Amino acid sequence: MVVKITDKMKFSRSFDYVDNGIEHGVLSKFEPKEILLKKGTLIAEGFKPLDCDIKMLKDVPVKLRDGVTIYTDIYLPNNCKKVPTLIAWSPYGKSAGTAPRYKNLFNMLGMGNAWNSGLTKFEAPDPSYWCAHGYAVCNPDMRGIAHSEGNTTMVGSQEAQDGYDLIEWIASQEWSNSKTALTGTSYLAFSQWYIAAEQPPHLTCINPTEGLSDGYRDLAFIGGIPDKNFIERLQVNHVSAKGAKRENLVKEMDCYPLATAEVWKDKVADTSKITVPAFVIASYSNTLHTMGTFRSWRNLGSKEKWLRIHDKQEWPYYYDKDNVEELRRFFDYYLLDKDNGWNKTSQVRYSLIDFQGNNTNDISTGTFPPSETSNTKYFFNPLTRTLQDNAGKTDVVLRYDTQSLPGKISFQKTFDKKTTFVDYPKLKLYMEVENYNVESQRKTRHGVKRI
């Protein structure tokens, strides 16, 4: 008997779906139809007018390989040309650009909402801009989201197969030039690793902007430490669906604490299987996505790949006007066959962070880490609380109380000349818990104890 990975997952009832045209955006009510949105239209107060006429195909059904039907919104230039498609895969609601929760979020960040048209799915490309430049934008509700059938899973092979099916469906449509790309930040980035690894024939290129690639190591047990808080918030942000179930990662953390569990192994992206061109965006400061983005970049099977390491938060970076223009050069080259010189772009560009605010950006190099860097080891000096070049000759025990301030031990290093840190930092620690009875066990993957 073949056991599907979904049989191993733990599910809970989805949250109730509110279909009032407000909670999930002004265009969220279920109304399968074609709408002509005229240039200059204001989708909602506080957003910018549309850049061009857009044909909106609303709540279009797409049948997946197992018979489940999902629904997607598709935005097209209002002409008869065949166009490439940008796909934004996520569980956050295909029409939620004007939802109060996201309007408030971007206001809180100081970005406001006038940078987009209101058609923009959370963390996704703005259809107004891309339709004006000859692209279609596909905003699907994945299975178990809003009116899409089935139960929602989070990260892994089920989503990857569904994304594959959507890509191949798009390629068969009369308005499609058969070329597609995946783009977006965060969830819309890490879903790309999984979908692209399935190698859909009509996926042309990808643009992951900061995305984890291992559901266990990057999300649930970061550094081996359980982190249920963010997962709970992530699951709450999933748009719900009436009568559906959602995968409950918190329950799975309790049931499957080891990375060897099938559920967690299914959530590891094999980016070596990705062969399409990739424009990968990373940063040093995203505790959720940094490790997975760099790991994926290193392991990518793509022969044509670019890495840009920026000095901002992912959303201001992704929606910055100049960065959008550069992304269009990448897509124009592969999706519209424009000979715009993108292939001559430096394979790696990185930033240097200066704590006085004088950051240096877009330093070009052929590899990352840059070939001119050298790995340097530093050792703790427990007596001076500094870092030194050589290991000490005597062992010294340092203690701190986790229940009182400062709750940490710090070490400093003062450099006598200008020094730049570029590369993946590594730290090896030896720690011991005192005055506790500790029981050590080792288990096989089948749960058999070995003492």
Regions found by a protein language model. Name each.
Residues F30-G40, N104:
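Short beta-strand/loop turn elements enriched in aromatics
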Residues V2-P32, A44, K312-I451:
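C-terminal, loop-rich substrate-recognition/catalytic regions characterized by aromatic stacking residues
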Residues T41-N343, Q347:
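Active-site-proximal cap/loop segments of hydrolase catalytic domains
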